[in-house]
Amino acid sequence: MSEQDYLYWSAKNLINAFKSKKLSPLEVTKECLSRAKKIQNECNAFTEYFDQIALEQAKIAENSYLGKTHEPRLLEGISLAIKEEFALNNSHRSSGSKIFKDRVDSFTDVYIQRLLDGGSIPIFKTTTPEFCLLGTTWSDLHGVTTNPWNKKYTPGGSSGGSGVALATGSCAIASGSDIGGSIRIPAAACGVFGYKPPYGRNPEVPYGNLDYYSHS
């Protein structure tokens, strides 16, 4: 099965392939990491990679589908890109600002933890403009993120790195946040599905978000 055949599959199709043993979570995770590192030179969409934990979690997922451990969870083995404004234990969270370039979190946001508890695998963090306050994705800290379909254009913002990750097949699902279009603009610009859930459906994080306008 070629790289093109499965890196663009939906999470549902990947899970079905894992269950039927047509695909291995470990194989897919390795390919996602490889793809992301190739794409980085072209689009500059990623800020941090989690190779070790991703491969460890992928092996756990693989054993689950082989019936060696626990029952597969809802998102077992599904690769997850995390927007850089969200906290993941032992990872950097600058929100695109030099002010917080050295901040490393000792906790994981509830929104992300729920995805991890469902079996998803964190593989990297994605770029965002400074404090997520632009409809494009660039910052003095991380530079300019470009659209994978045309490098002269933006992928939108502020979840532009996540949009690129999905559009390039570097992950199956990606986190984002949306006040004035920060999920919807990258989805439109990159040609992927983006959903802004109703207020209250997800925990309100990060804590600086703007009350009823904030949806993760």
Residue ranges and their predicted role:
Residues 2-179:
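Gly/Ser-rich catalytic/binding loops embedded in alpha/beta enzyme cores
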Residues 142, 163-216:
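Fold-level recognition of mixed alpha/beta catalytic cores in primary-metabolism enzymes, strongest
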